[in-house]
Amino acid sequence: WIMGHMVNAIAQIDEFVSLGANSIETDVSFDKNANPEYTYHGIPCDCGRTCTKWEYFNTFLGGLRKATTPGDSKYHEKLVLVVFDLKTGSLYDNQAYDAGTKLAKSLLQNYWNKGNNGGRAYIVLSIPNLDHYKLITGFKETLTKEEHPELMDKVGYDFSGNDDIGDVAKAYKKAGVTGHVWQSDGITNCLLRGLDRVRKAVANRDSSNGYINKVYYWTVDKRASTRDALDAGVDGIMTNYPDVIADVLSESAYTAKFRIATYDDNPWETFKN
């Protein structure tokens, strides 16, 4: 999965997909009542990027729905996965459940079109704080209450705080999550980070009793660091330059081992080294 980083304006969806992304990451900020409000990152952000592009969250979902609904004039067949980077740092811990509830309602209405030919992309809810695991509970219970539990088949999870892998496993246990787990590791492109924790995550994925289904690394903009991440066995790379990742994937060293994921590739299925 080539994951376009910080895609917060509708116009950027076309831009990143045309550069080779089959997945995008979108920031979601919340108001003080735990309503998802904007797709917005803010300053500071990655080096070389404009930090302040934004839409209202529900407006963005409408654009995203069009981009992922077959038959729509804005449809992109290859856009198959969306990571919502949920900026829950502005919320109190006890608001996490409400945030999950409100997020589910927004997606149901504006993305899934109440289950009637809505957007088809797989969704990853990426949460920065292990203490906010109840966001997952709120999300799940709301879709059940709204009589669309089947949509959970399209939803996966990520805790993005670079926490100890054992602590992440405990948070999933509390949330009752037993699959659909993506594990992120990384840092802003302005700084360097080694691959030690990525290797631990890959080892967990490849073990017989691990909780991780897929591992992705962020934010990778250079060919050398792309090769290092691929050599470590990641499933996804988040980048500001999808064309760089696509270029490296076309090198002879990688064409035999990797290919770009399509809609038929189940993102919750573990593919071991």
From Swiss-Prot:
Single GO MF descriptor: phosphoric diester hydrolase activity
Give the tissue specificity: Expressed by the venom gland.
Name the UniProt record assigns to this protein: Dermonecrotic toxin LsaSicTox-alphaIB1bi
Q: What is the lineage of its organism?
A: Eukaryota, Metazoa, Ecdysozoa, Arthropoda, Chelicerata
Keywords, A to Z, come to: Cytolysis, Dermonecrotic toxin, Disulfide bond, Hemolysis, Lipid degradation, Lipid metabolism, Lyase, Magnesium, Metal-binding, Secreted, Toxin
UniProt-listed GO biological process terms: killing of cells of another organism; lipid catabolic process
Q: Which cofactor does it need?
A: Mg(2+)
**GO cellular-component terms in the record?**
extracellular region
Membrane-traversing stretches: none
Coiled-coil annotated spans = none
Q: Which family does it belong to?
A: Belongs to the arthropod phospholipase D family. Class II subfamily.
Q: Which InterPro entries match?
A: PLC-like_Pdiesterase_TIM-brl (IPR017946)
Tagged with keyword Zinc = no
Give me the residues that bind Mg(2+), please.
Answer: E25, D27, D85
Taken from the UniProt record, the cysteine pairs bridged by disulfide bonds within this chain are C45-C51, C47-C190
Location within or outside the cell: Secreted
* Reactions performed catalytically: an N-(acyl)-sphingosylphosphocholine = an N-(acyl)-sphingosyl-1,3-cyclic phosphate + choline; an N-(acyl)-sphingosylphosphoethanolamine = an N-(acyl)-sphingosyl-1,3-cyclic phosphate + ethanolamine; a 1-acyl-sn-glycero-3-phosphocholine = a 1-acyl-sn-glycero-2,3-cyclic phosphate + choline; a 1-acyl-sn-glycero-3-phosphoethanolamine = a 1-acyl-sn-glycero-2,3-cyclic phosphate + ethanolamine
Q: Cofactor note from UniProt?
A: Binds 1 Mg(2+) ion per subunit.
